[in-house]
Amino acid sequence: MRVPFADLKKEFKRVLLNLLFAEAKAELCAHILAANSRDGVYSHGLNRFSAFVNSVKGKEVDVYAEPGFVESHGMIDIWDGNSGAGMYNASKAMDRAIEMAKTNGIGCLAMRNTNHWMRGGTYGWQAADAGCIGICFTNTMANMPPWGGKEPRLGNNPLIIAVPHTDGHIVLDMAMTQYSYGKLQQSRMNNEEMEVYAGYDGDGSLTHNPSAIIKSRRALPIGYWKGSGLAFILDVLLTAITGGKSTAAINSTVNESGVSQFFLCLYKSDYNQMLIDEIIRYTKSSATVEPGGHIRYPGENTLATRQFNEEHGIPVDEMKWEELLKM
């Protein structure tokens, strides 16, 4: 089943308005959620909407809250998200980082006490669309064991790096686990196994089974000990600069809330597109493992999915769609 982008966005907005979000805030949040599904990140669009609604009803998300300025240190602004909607707060934070970068060449904003931003790549695309290099990351609840450990003590702390490109922006959007938990949940819902080992089951054996990994909470870090180390240092950096909650503090709450996020923008008038094109051509010149296979740069597949779904409609799970219509 497929639905037009406009219809999906309209239904999101209707529900958000009924939850007492202000018009402009409902519009922005609905657009981000619909765009996530449009771009193929279904786990952070329609499929996560009911969880977001529950977080509003459970008072983890304050529909009236606006992110607020706390202090500045040169080109670094510190904000408090005031427990507002994560995607709204993140979009406003990236807007401010872009504004600073357009004036000074660099802009940085760190925010504490905010909520899940849904797809982190949204804010990389936002920066690149504005002509800026964008780097952002967030901490999360503990959902990954440190390398050598059995129990979740690290967040999968997604990292996004975006570079403007005339033929389609380059946008890397990656969790510190081999697969995000959203992707694991999506695969479980579709009764699909993961393509490569994604974590450990309850017996400590590597597995492709998303249900076993979600139950054990032992997702596999990217690059093994390297991903574990990167997840750790991102949490340290965020906590040090924002004065907000670390993964340890986030995990002391019943549900994931009060996370910290970081937004960095760089701006110059010319990004040497010919040199970037050279990197892309050279990368794609490799022989493929599978005959007729494709080598893609980060963000390329997102653009292809976006264009296809804009033309043919966004694929939706019928049960999730009916659930949305009844909200």
PLM region descriptions:
Residues 1-3, 10, 14-28, 34, ...:
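Acidic, glycine/proline-rich low-complexity segments that act as flexible tails and inter-domain linkers
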Residues 46-100:
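Active-site cofactor/substrate anionic-group-binding motifs, chiefly glycine-
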Residues 2-3, 8, 18, 241, ...:
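Catalytic-core signal marking the mid-to-C-terminal active-site face
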Residues 154, 158-161, 175, 229-245, ...:
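N-terminal nucleophile
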Residues 144-211:
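Phosphate/diphosphate-binding glycine-rich loops and adjacent basic-rich segments that engage nucleotide
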Residues 189-250:
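Secondary-shell segments that build the walls of catalytic and ion/ligand-binding clefts
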Residues 76-166:
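A generic, well-ordered mixed alpha/beta core segment in the N-terminal half of proteins
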